[in-house]
Curated annotation (Swiss-Prot):
GO terms for molecular function: rRNA binding; structural constituent of ribosome; transferase activity. Keywords: Chloroplast, Plastid, Ribonucleoprotein, Ribosomal protein. PANTHER family: LARGE RIBOSOMAL SUBUNIT PROTEIN UL2M, RIBOSOMAL PROTEIN L2. InterPro entries: NA-bd_OB-fold, Rib_uL2_dom2, Ribosomal_uL2, Ribosomal_uL2_bac/org-type, Ribosomal_uL2_C, Ribosomal_uL2_CS, Ribosomal_uL2_dom3, Ribosomal_uL2_RNA-bd_dom. Residues 1-22, 225-252 are annotated as: Disordered. This is Large ribosomal subunit protein uL2cz/uL2cy. GO terms for cellular component: chloroplast; mitochondrial large ribosomal subunit. It comes from Barbarea verna (Land cress). Belongs to the universal ribosomal protein uL2 family. Pfam families: Ribosomal_L2 (PF00181), Ribosomal_L2_C (PF03947).
Length: 274
């Protein structure tokens, strides 16, 4: 991804840094309208998730996370922008006439061929079970449950690494630094997700943030005591506590939120690094 800088004629162009324009011309049979789930509200209209609302209308692209078109070669026809994720997507034309979207692997270009199945070549964009991959392979779009489709390492620039295979399980190092076990029969896609420079983007102005459906974030220390535990005081005052808390008084910034008795606790060998 190439970062594009504008001529500094306004504050928004001076501070903004956007990626090169990748056009989107989705196929009608691979898109459908998506309800935005109340923009952070529940069925009664009460805010349950803050800082959400507004945003441009979107059409959801059906992404093939399962990669279950076995032993059928496909060709990359287009590389498109997807408003629902920070990674690009590819339109694949398969040999049997079917067309699907997949996540764009880093380095893939229009005209490349991909295939899914067992014992397929270890090539960027190919999908196969972990048991058929050599150790050290860089992978993304990893299944947790067999046949459910990829659920791990799907964001732009994400990549995991196969570090061991023993018995019925494979050991993976995830992008977060977590090391966990997954069934060797689960499939994954070879390579890294594209658009690796997405973290270099700068929106440059508040309006661009609103287009993404993200509302402004206000610090608790500038609120009144009735609105936040950090609020109040004369002038610029500290929070008045040993540790920061949420608007509802629960510990924030560092407290672990994962359930201790979750079913997958035994599959995690090393928790993610901070």
């Amino acid at each position: 991804m190439a970062i594009h800088l504008y001529k500094t004629s306004t504050p928004s162009t001076r501070n903004g840094a956007v990626d090169s324009q990748v056009k989107s011309n989705p196929r009608n049979n691979l898109i459908y309208g998506q309800h935005h789930c109340g923009k952070g509200r529940n069925a009664r209209g009460i805010i349950t998730v803050r800082h959400r609302g507004g945003g441009h209308k979107r059409l959801y692209r059906k992404i093939d996370f399962r990669r279950n078109a076995k032993d059928i070669y496909g060709r990359i026809v287009t590389i498109e922008y997807d408003p629902n994720r920070n990674a690009y997507i590819c339109l694949i034309h398969y040999g049997d006439g079917e067309k699907r979207y997949i996540l764009h692997p880093r380095g893939a270009i229009i005209g490349d061929t991909i295939v899914s199945g067992t014992e397929v070549p270890i090539k960027m964009g190919n999908a196969l079970p972990l048991t058929d991959m050599p150790l050290g392979t860089a992978i993304h779009n990893i299944e947790i449950t067999l046949g459910k489709g990829g659920q791990l390492a799907r964001a732009a620039g994400a990549v995991a690494k196969l570090i061991a295979k023993e018995g019925k399980s494979a050991t993976l190092k995830l992008p977060s630094g977590e090391v966990r076990l997954i069934s060797k029969n689960c499939s994954a896609t070879v390579g890294q997700v594209g658009n690796v420079g997405v973290n270099q983007k700068s929106l440059g102005r508040a309006g661009s943030k609103c287009w993404l459906g993200k509302r402004p974030v206000v610090r608790g220390v500038v609120m009144n005591p009735v609105d936040h535990p950090h609020g109040g005081g004369e002038g610029r005052a500290p929070i008045g506590r040993k540790k920061p808390v949420t608007p509802w008084g629960y510990p924030a910034l560092g407290r672990r939120t994962r359930k201790r008795k979750k079913y997958s606790e035994t599959m995690i060998l090393r928790r993610r690094s901070k």
